[in-house]
Amino acid sequence: DDDARTLTIVLKQAKADLRKDLAYPVFVILDVSGDYDLAENPIGTGPYALTSFDSKTKATLVKNKYYWNGEVPYDNVEIDFLSEDNKAMALQNGDVNLVENITSASDLETLKKDDNFNVSIGQGVRCGFAYINEKGILKDDALRQALQMALDHKTMCEVTVGGLYTEGISVLPSSLAYGYDNLKNPYEFNTDKAKKLLDDAGYKDTDGDGIREMNGKNISIRYITYENRRLSDFAQAIQTQLKDLGIDVKIDSMNADKEWNLMVAGEYDLCDSNWITVGNGDPTEYL
């Protein structure tokens, strides 16, 4: 209704979280009969309108004079796409006014100590995942269970990435009140128990090289990863901890697209990813 400036949405079935979905940036309202190139010319409803876009370097925006929710504070906004290693430096050099998602604990500590900057850290709903391929070399239950028991997630979160993560046991983050505190990890960290599991299953180091064997060959696992929010740091920590168990881990680092394709194809032993799990605030999105 143009006069009343209202929109009526008719659904095929009830959807309690519809309003949250409409506010989630992943969802876009479009005319289905239109012809769009959203990858290069996105259409939004926010306070700024896109004027130029380069997926590798920068997005330039201007004030949206039709914005529905009051005065827009800035006439122009430039968003630079920086690597994780360059964000803090760009801020310190005065090249940018604001940065988000600094994932280096050392960079954050440096900025905290500098009175020229305000550092804000909050709990989010993003989770880091490690996936185990239950086919191939890791098809044996005992081997998979031992791997999980051999990993000290608490130390990885507190030391490896400087406390930027919280140890997780669910796809739902601890920052939400969805009963997370009642969950129990069935594979609590216990190196001795993990080693006994492998010994009892017959996976032993018979030649003294520090690596256990399966069918006469060293157990070597391929771990695929990509550089995002310290995933590579976790991969290296897992590699180190599993070596103590007697398992060799080969890390194969690549871009996110290649890793995703290999994961879908099942061409990995271990892999990781990093996702916002409840973007609209409703856990049913991920269940």
What do these predicted ranges mean?
Residues 120-132:
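Periplasmic-binding protein-like
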Residues 102-114, 277-282:
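A ligand-binding cleft/hinge motif common to bilobed small-molecule-binding domains
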Residues 85-97, 113-114, 142, 236-245, ...:
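Short helices/loops that flank or line small-molecule/ion binding pockets
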Residues 7-9, 46-49, 59-60, 75-81, ...:
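Short, well-ordered beta-strand elements
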Residues 14-72, 76, 86, 190-192, ...:
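Gly/Pro-rich hinge or "lid" segments in bacterial periplasmic/extracellular proteins
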Residues 139-240:
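Append "and occasionally in soluble cytosolic enzymes with long acidic Gly/Pro-rich linkers
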Residues 36, 64-109, 248-250:
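Ligand-site clamp/hinge motif
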Residues 260-287:
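Acidic-aromatic pocket-rim loops
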